[in-house]
Amino acid sequence: MKKEFGKVGVLFGGRSAEREVSLMSGKGVLAALLSKGIDAHPFDPAERSLAELAAEKFDRVFIALHGRFGEDGSLQGALEQLGIPYTGPGVMASAIAMDKVITKRVCLSHGVPTPKFTALEVEATTAEQLQAIAAEFGMPLMLKAPHEGSTIGIAKVETAEGMQAGFDLCAKYDDVVLVEQFVKGRELTVPVLGSGRNARALPIVEIIAPQGNYDYEHKYFSDDTQYLCPAPFDAAFTKRVQALAVSAFNAVGCTGWARVDFLVRESDNEPFLLEINTSPGMTGHSLVPMSAKVAGTAYEDLCVEILRMAKLGLKPVQHK
């Protein structure tokens, strides 16, 4: 496989709030690629300049970075400038999916349902506005920092009196706070591989966390969280959710791979989009490898498949 892929950089670590998770993902991917005979090397953008990728003649990179500066389009843009093919979605799709508010707006326009929401600018929002939203939406509410992942910068607010504290917590991470109607129900995720008409959904994973608290600790370090894969739904519902996942994936322009998260409302079994993750975790607790395994693809083979789809999203201008 050395000839097929050349010199491969595995990008992990980085400068986001999700650095710890990225280190775990990257080490797993690196070991998997090495086990397949691929000339793979670790590369931490927090410690080295991206220009070194070109100087050291890397042929392609596997992005195992999470959060800002890794899956928000900025890294993808730099790699486009360097002319180095990379895994996962391109500049535009990465930037859209990193913003939960824009993702919701785009997916709604393509018929993918999402919980009722609004976006508030931190500097312009008053206490009175928070109370008005609480009255309009009803309680409880989910408040989120739109550009963070791994459950960072999220607050569940049970009462109107708790709005300010929840808002302030999210404001530590972002200039905008997403306010979302709370949906009581089951949490699902659907990995998607491929591009366009060839995009395909993998088996659905249902996440059952203790007391429904799927936070950072339970997501990456706890053995108490249960995962059901394939999720126990009938064939018709499974097909519907997988189709919604592919629709959301294509709506924002994803290519390569991504993970689409949903909530299924308890009262009527209706699915709602939560977010799209364009650089999903690849740790021992991660959901994409879990789903792929059920579909018959081992972790090492999944890493190779993702790497094989690495590409540049922008065609260079041909000057005459």
UniProtKB/Swiss-Prot annotation:
Pfam families: Dala_Dala_lig_C, Dala_Dala_lig_N
HAMAP family: Dala_Dala_lig (MF_00047)
Keyword ATP-binding: yes
ATP-grasp domain segment(s): 104-308
Biological classification of the source: Bacteria, Pseudomonadati, Pseudomonadota, Betaproteobacteria, Burkholderiales
Gene Ontology CC annotation, any one: cytosol
Residue positions binding ATP: 134-189
Gene transcribed to yield this protein: ddl
Gene source species: Janthinobacterium sp. (strain Marseille)
Alphabetic keyword roster: ATP-binding, Cell shape, Cell wall biogenesis/degradation, Cytoplasm, Ligase, Magnesium, Manganese, Metal-binding, Nucleotide-binding, Peptidoglycan synthesis
Name listed for the protein in its UniProt record: D-alanine--D-alanine ligase
GO molecular function ontology, one term from the record: ATP binding
Pathway field: Cell wall biogenesis; peptidoglycan biosynthesis
Cited function: Cell wall formation.
A Gene Ontology BP annotation from the UniProt entry: regulation of cell shape
